[in-house]
Design a protein with these regions (language model features):
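A structural signal for well-ordered alpha-helical scaffolds and beta->alpha junctions
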Residues: 1-2, 22-26, 37, 64, ...
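Secondary-structure boundary/capping signal
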Residues: 12-13, 78-79, 99
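Internal catalytic-core helix/loop-beta-alpha segment
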Residues: 35-94
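C-terminal capping/extension of enzyme domains
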Residues: 4, 51-68, 93-151
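Short, surface-exposed acidic-centric catalytic microdomains
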Residues: 1-58
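Generic structural signal for beta-strand residues in well-ordered domains
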Residues: 31-33, 73, 111
């Protein structure tokens, strides 16, 4: 995820990484997210990985996140985005999506008493078979459409 944001905002995928420590610059990431009015949260509070790997295909969602409760705390939120197949399934059910958007696309939904855009983004995982530049372009379009790059 942070390589994507580094590429979008700084034209450098390593901006938010500290290669010497093999970690991320947490305070810089928090500052960037706050500055651009971006909130992040998992689609599920509890999951079970059935094969012990990161694949969505064998991921059981034990407890989905209470999206309605989260959105009640963010009155200015205009969009919800998923970053993978399983999260898209979980969130689309909660949002009452009539149809799932294609990867990199969005649909407008009315959920929890408000209109929202629901984006189905490509997985940010390096294991997802899409070039980083293409992922960044999809995320850039989403951030532009939601106004997050205009702040």
């Amino acid at each position: 995820m942070w390589r994507i944001f580094g590429l979008i905002l700084h034209e450098n995928p390593l901006t938010y990484l500290d290669p010497s420590l093999k970690t991320f610059h947490l305070e810089a990431i928090r500052s960037m997210l706050t500055r651009h009015h971006i909130a992040l949260y998992d689609a599920a509070c509890s999951v079970r990985r059935l094969d012990g790997n990161a694949s969505d295909a064998r991921l059981e969602v034990v407890e989905p996140t209470d999206l309605e409760s989260l959105l009640q705390q963010m009155s200015e939120c205009v969009a919800v985005a998923s970053t993978g197949g399983r999260s898209a399934e979980v969130l689309s059910r909660q949002l009452g999506c009539a149809r799932m958007p294609g990867v990199g696309a969005s649909v407008e939904v009315t959920a929890f008493g408000r209109r929202l855009l629901f984006f189905r983004m490509p997985s940010s995982s390096r294991a997802y078979p899409m070039k980083l530049e293409r992922k960044a372009e999809a995320y850039r379009r989403m951030l532009m459409e939601t106004g997050c790059l205009n702040v």
